[in-house]
């Protein structure tokens, strides 16, 4: 059956591109837009000239009645193909690469000689190949088409290997998958089109060898090499953006650089970062970040996994925030350390916050770390150093509010009434929700007004209450047995019930009573949720899916608790498969729950327990 070139796009390439675009939509960021614009511009301009050259020399031909128009020597649909292929491969590569932080594949500690060899050997081989191919590309000869492909692709591959070769070698599976699947798909489209007579490859300028019927080896080589160029280009941009994100210092008054710089300025900065070898980068920065993420990974595997649905730069900063919260929480919760020592460490943390917000830069070198090194654990110091990079985003008030929550627990103060419950929950949960929201809003494509920012933050703080109330409702027995604590308002309880719960005997107040208390708290959370979940729609679109997923998964615990009628579970739990289902549907805004949830809050164990059970 004869296919027109436009039908090839309508039936094959565009539907797949549409699916990839839909899958990528929740994660689409300004960095992705930059990738698409830059790589498409380069691919289109270079491929247009190259393709006109080979068509002029009759290496590739098309059915004259199968195209809508010809520009130069090349059909309009072929120009479309350059753009579609670039968008398709880059979109797929983004989906494959996004699940790990790009900065983890930059290694300043790598020996210089190793880096020189890893760069020099492939670059030399690629340039020699390009040189020989240039001289073999004689029009009308069997090696013409294949040689043209090699001299076109190999110099670009050499350049990209110079800037990102080691980075890509550290994630080989992701790179290979990103190259292989688009290549196989486009080869299949090529087989269909050649078989249908849409276009053809001249036997006079090719070897006449086929990988499979209707797939000349030159066509396979073209798709494999050009997809390799596109994947290498995507990885190179990922690496440069990771470097810029870590090493471009920001003042409290400076927005993220990609929002305030022109396209040309961004390209110039990226060129600078592209040329930097790993060894000139500050290794302590990567060490501190790695330690912070180890804290996150060990403390909450669930949140570590769930954070993958956020864009890389947002995910990195949320992870740093979590590590700081966890590290400071551990300072106050470590029962092996005397209470007085923990109180002194809390005072020290207050001093760190004052020092941090008393400076005019986010650079960790502005802090006198020798003062803290002698009094805090090494892991805590690393978390603090990474946290300094959030100086330009956060405000001191929310951090100090969180520290007030730690003080409440250190003093083992009781929650006497509803007002105490709200105050404590605001300290340990709303404060974190506010900080998460400020991080997310800092990565918005367009800055929100002051009034709108305050409204969104208020919704996030309310969501903090929702999640903390759910947390307390779920852990009445656990808090009693493990901590000897009662986080329920004491004016909800009799003196005997308070004594039983604080004595580790919460079960003895009865199953129905436990259910009644937990449901009462959940229903309060439900009422707050009605207003709190409105904030999500005002967040940057590329973060809404992640926030929605995290909150919906946690709110499902409240739904689970309400399903119990006769027995209060020690720890209500939503199964892994159900959590995955809720998270995936939430990312694409397809999840419908009894109570819709959204916002940007995570809480700590006993204080931060929410994050540990997502």
From Swiss-Prot:
InterPro entries: Isoprenoid_synthase_dom_sf, Lycopene_cyclase_dom, Squ/phyt_synthse, Squalene/phytoene_synthase_CS, Trans_IPPS_bact-type, Trans_IPPS_HH. PANTHER family: BIFUNCTIONAL LYCOPENE CYCLASE/PHYTOENE SYNTHASE. It is a multi-pass membrane protein. It is found in: Membrane. Pathway: Carotenoid biosynthesis; beta-carotene biosynthesis; Carotenoid biosynthesis; phytoene biosynthesis; all-trans-phytoene from geranylgeranyl diphosphate: step 1/1. It comes from Mucor circinelloides f. lusitanicus. It catalyses: all-trans-lycopene = gamma-carotene; gamma-carotene = all-trans-beta-carotene; 2 (2E,6E,10E)-geranylgeranyl diphosphate = 15-cis-phytoene + 2 diphosphate. One of its GO terms (biological process) is carotenoid biosynthetic process. This is Bifunctional lycopene cyclase/phytoene synthase. The chain crosses the membrane at residues 2-22, 36-56, 70-90, 120-140, 143-163, 174-194, 217-237. Keywords: Carotenoid biosynthesis, Isomerase, Membrane, Multifunctional enzyme, Transferase, Transmembrane, Transmembrane helix. In the N-terminal section; belongs to the lycopene beta-cyclase family. In the C-terminal section; belongs to the phytoene/squalene synthase family.
């Amino acid at each position: 059956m004869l296919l027109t070139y436009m039908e090839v796009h309508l039936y094959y390439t565009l539907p797949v591109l549409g699916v990839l675009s839909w899958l990528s939509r929740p994660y689409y960021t300004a960095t992705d837009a930059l990738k698409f614009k830059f790589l498409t511009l380069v691919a289109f301009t270079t491929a247009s000239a190259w393709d006109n050259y080979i068509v002029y020399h009759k290496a590739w031909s098309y059915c004259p009645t199968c195209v809508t128009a010809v520009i130069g020597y090349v059909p309009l649909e072929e120009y479309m193909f350059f753009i579609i292929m670039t968008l398709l491969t880059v979109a797929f590569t983004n989906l494959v690469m996004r699940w790990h932080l790009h900065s983890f594949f930059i290694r300043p500690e790598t020996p210089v000689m190793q880096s020189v060899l890893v760069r020099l050997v492939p670059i030399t081989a690629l340039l020699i190949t390009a040189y020989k191919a240039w001289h073999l590309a004689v029009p009308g000869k069997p090696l013409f088409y294949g040689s043209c492909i090699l001299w076109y692709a190999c110099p670009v591959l050499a350049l990209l290997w110079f800037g990102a070769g080691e980075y890509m070698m550290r994630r080989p599976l992701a790179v290979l998958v990103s190259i292989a699947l688009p290549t196989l798909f486009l080869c299949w489209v090529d087989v269909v089109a050649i078989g249908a007579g849409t276009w053809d490859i001249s036997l006079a300028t090719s070897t006449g060898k086929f990988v499979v019927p209707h797939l000349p080896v030159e066509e396979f080589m073209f798709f494999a090499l050009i997809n390799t160029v596109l994947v290498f280009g995507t990885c190179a941009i990922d690496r440069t953006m990771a470097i810029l994100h870590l090493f471009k210092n920001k003042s409290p008054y400076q927005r993220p650089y990609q929002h305030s710089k022109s396209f040309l300025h961004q390209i110039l900065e990226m060129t600078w970062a592209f040329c930097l070898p790993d060894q000139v980068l500050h290794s302590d920065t990567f060490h501190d970040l790695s330690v912070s993420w180890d804290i996150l990974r060990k403390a909450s595997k669930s949140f570590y996994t769930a954070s993958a649905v956020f864009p890389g730069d947002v995910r990195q900063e949320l992870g740093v925030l979590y590590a700081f919260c966890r590290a400071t929480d551990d300072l106050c919760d470590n029962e092996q350390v005397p209470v007085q020592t923990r109180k002194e460490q809390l005072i020290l943390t207050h001093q760190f916050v004052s020092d941090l917000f008393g400076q005019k830069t986010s650079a960790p070198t502005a802090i006198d770390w020798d003062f803290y090194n002698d009094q805090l654990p090494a892991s805590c110091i690393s978390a603090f150093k990474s946290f300094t990079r959030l100086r330009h985003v956060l405000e001191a008030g929310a951090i100090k509010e969180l520290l007030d929550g730690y003080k409440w627990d250190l003093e083992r103060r009781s929650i006497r009434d509803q007002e105490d419950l709200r105050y404590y929950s605001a300290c340990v949960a709303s404060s974190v929700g506010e900080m998460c929201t400020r991080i997310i809003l800092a990565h918005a494509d367009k800055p929100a007004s002051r009034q709108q920012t305050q409204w969104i933050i208020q919704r996030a703080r309310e969501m903090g209450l929702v999640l903390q109330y759910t947390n307390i409702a779920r852990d009445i027995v656990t808090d009693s047995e493990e901590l000897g604590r009662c986080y329920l308002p004491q004016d909800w309880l009799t003196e005997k019930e308070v004594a039983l719960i604080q004595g580790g005997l919460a079960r003895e107040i009865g199953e129905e009573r436990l259910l009644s208390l937990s449901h009462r708290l959940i229903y309060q959370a439900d009422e707050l949720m009605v207003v709190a979940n409105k904030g999500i729609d005002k967040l940057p679109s590329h973060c809404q899916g992640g926030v929605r997923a995290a909150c919906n998964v946690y709110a499902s615990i409240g739904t689970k608790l309400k399903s119990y009628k006769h027995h209060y579970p020690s720890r209500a739990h939503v199964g892994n498969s159900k959590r995955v289902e809720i998270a995936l549907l939430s990312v694409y805004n397809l999840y419908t729950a009894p109570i819709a949830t959204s916002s940007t809050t995570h809480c700590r164990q006993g204080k931060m327990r929410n994050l540990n059970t997502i």
